[in-house]
Amino acid sequence: MSDALLKVESLTKHYPIEAGWFKTNVPVVRAVEDVSFTVQAGETLCVVGESGCGKSTLARLLMRLIDPTSGRVLVEGTDIAGLRKNELRAWRRRMQMVFQDPYSSLNPRLTAGQIITEPVENFECLSRRQRQELATDLLRKVGMSPEMASRYPSEMSGGQRQRLGIARALALKPSLIIADEAVSALDVSVQAQILNLLMDLQQETGIALIFISHDLAVVEHIGHRVAVMYLGRIVELSPRDALFAKPVHPYTEALIAAAPVPDPARARLEVPLEGEVPSPVNPPSGCAFHPRCPLAVDRCRAEVPPLVPMPDGRAVACHVRAPAAAAHISPSALASLALPKTVQPGGTILARR
C-alpha cells in the first residue's frame, strides 16, 4: 500500500466563548473533536453529517484557513498545522478548495481569465500569452468556452461559476482538492454535470478529493470511502459500498433511512431517531449521540466510544455495535483505518437519484 497523501491525526478545534469581565471558566464550542483519517492519491473521501456537525470547520482546518487547537495535518509527510505563514505558502500549491457558494467565492471585479490565473501569479511571473493559454486550457478542461475568459462572474450562471471555481482550483496543479458542499447550491441537472466533471478530472490527473456533502445520493456515486460526522467527531469511517449496504453505527443507519427512496418497491429502513443535535457548547457526557440513540446503554452515557476497526475494514465508534475491548489505538494507526487497497473511481453520474 502506498504512503498516504494526507494524514490527519487527532485534529481538534475549540472556539472559546468570551463571557464576563474576567473571562474565567470560559466555555468553548467543540467544533471538531479528535478527528483522524487518511486520504490516498486518486481517492475520494466523502464527509457527511447534519448541519453543524463540523464538516466545514474540518475543511478549513485542513486548508489551514484557521489554526487547530491541537492535532496534526500531514501533507506528504509534512505537518502543515505547525508551519509558520511564510513556510505554509509553498504548501498552498498542493491543496486547493472549491467553496460552497459559487456567487460569493469569486471576485466580481475580475474576469474569468484573471480569476483563473491569479493563484498562479502569486508564485510565478507569467507573460500575457501564458496567462491567456492557461485560462483557455483550464476553461476547456472544465467544459467552458474559451470566450468566457473575458466575462465577469455576474454574467455567468451558477453552474458556470462553480466550473470557474474548479478551474481556479486546478490552476496550481494541486494534489488534493477539498470541495465543501460544492454542488448543494445548484439545481439537479447542473449538480450531475459538476460531479461528472470532478470524477473525469480525477481520472485524468490522479488528484485526491475530500468531498463534503449532506446528500447521500451524491456521496454514494462519487465516494470511495465515507466519514460520518456527528457533533464534531467521526462516528463511522467505511468503504462506500459497505456503508450503504450495511451501516453499523446507529446514526449512520438513521441518516441512510432518512434519505428519500424513489423506487416505491424498495423497502425503506425504519430507524427511530428523535430530538435535535445537542449544542457543541454543552455536549452530552459519554457518547454525544446517546440522547437520540435507541440502542443506548449506561456505558454510552459515561464513556466516549473510541473509533475501533471492524473485521470488514471499516471503523466505528459505538459501545454497542463495536465494543472496544482492544487496547488503545494510536492516532497514527487510527488515521489509517479503512484505507482501500486500490482506488477505483465510480461510474459517470447521469442524474441524481
From Swiss-Prot:
Any GO BP: transmembrane transport
GO cellular component, one term: plasma membrane
Sorted UniProt keywords: Amino-acid transport, ATP-binding, Cell inner membrane, Cell membrane, Membrane, Nucleotide-binding, Plasmid, Transport
Keyword Nucleotide-binding: yes
Residues passing through the membrane, by range: none
Topology relative to the membrane: Peripheral membrane protein
SUPFAM superfamilies: P-loop containing nucleoside triphosphate hydrolases (SSF52540)
Gene Ontology molecular-function annotations: ATP binding; ATP hydrolysis activity
Compartment annotation: Cell inner membrane
Occurrences of domain ABC transporter (ranges): 6-256
Highest taxon in the source lineage: Bacteria
Keyword Cell inner membrane found: yes
Positions bound to ATP: G49, E50, S51, G52, C53, G54, K55, S56
Primary location class: membrane
NCBIfam families: oligo_HPY, PRK11308.1
Protein function: Probably part of a binding-protein-dependent transport system y4tOPQRS for a peptide. Probably responsible for energy coupling to the transport system.
Official protein name in the record: Probable peptide ABC transporter ATP-binding protein y4tS
Organism: Sinorhizobium fredii (strain NBRC 101917 / NGR234)
